[in-house]
Every structure is written in C-alpha cells, then in structure tokens.
Amino acid sequence: VIFHVGGHDDGALTAFDADTGSVVWSWEGDGPGYASPMVAVIDGVRQIVTVTQEHIVGVAADDGALLWERPFVSRSTNNSITPIIDGEDVIVTGHDLGVARFRPTRLGGRWTTETVWETDEVSMFMSTPVLADGTLCGMSHLRAGQFFALDAGSGETLWRTEGREATNSAVVRAGDLLFLLNNDGD
C-alpha cells in the first residue's frame, strides 16, 4: 500500500506492508499533491509515478529511491489529478498547465524526461481524465467547464464542448462506454 502522508510543505510518499501496516520505505521530497500514485514499468523498472506539491516523480517501487523528477507547479496548491500511464509514457495535467505527455528514459545510469507533446487547448483542475482506445477524455476547467477528447498519441484536440458544462466531473470508463458525471449529478 503506497500513498502520500502529511500535508503542505511536509510529507512523504510512503509504502506500507499490507499485512502489518509497518513502513517499508519512505521518500521525503516536497509535500503531497493529493493525486493517487500509479504503478508503471518503465525501461524494465517497476516504479511509482505520482504528483507532489511541485513535481511529478518516479520512485523505485522496491525501495522508494528517486529515479526522476519533472517540475510541475500549478496555480493551485492541490495537484490532485492522477497521472495517466500509457505504455512507458506519462500524461499529466494541472490547474492552468494544459496537458503534457512525456517519456521518462534512462541513459546509462541517469534518468531524464523527454516531452512528447504539450497542449494548452484544455487543462484540468480537479477532474482526472480517462484514456480509452488512444483517446484522452475529460473535463477541462477552461470556458467554465468543457468536456473534451484528445488524441493521446499526438495531443491533437479531437473535440470540445462549448463550455459552461460543469465545475468538475467524474469520468469513468466501463467497457466501451464512458460515463461523464458532472457536479450537478447530470
């Protein structure tokens, strides 16, 4: 079980033994970002990818050692949108940061991140998007809330609604269906 404990400016990404509750490892970088940590295998290394207060990080799943980090400072203090893992790439978004896809890579013994694409046509605040068959679907906070779809491979905007749809949305995939529930329950 892995999650970020603590609060603003003070926290640690922490792994706990599921049977005993004892701490297995703890990475003390900057404070938590309130997004759910994701497990990814990148370049053969099992790692935990998460958003912190000021970065997106990849730490080794077995011991919590920092592998890579990428600056990620949004207008809001709660980076709460869970990163999307697509193969060995990471797709991220934050309040007024647009959306970016990047690729962590290991060159020799050193990790780095390379931007694949970025767009500022949509951006998210509290609503995590969903990846469905190569399409990223979600709720942008721009234009007072608009649903959108992006080509996850290129970052091209496929469509956007007019706006004024909702403040936030829960986007859920169930088989071939997407459910987009707004904050009014519609």
Regions found by a protein language model. Give the residues of each.
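Noncatalytic, solvent-exposed loop/strand surfaces
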Residues: V1-D186
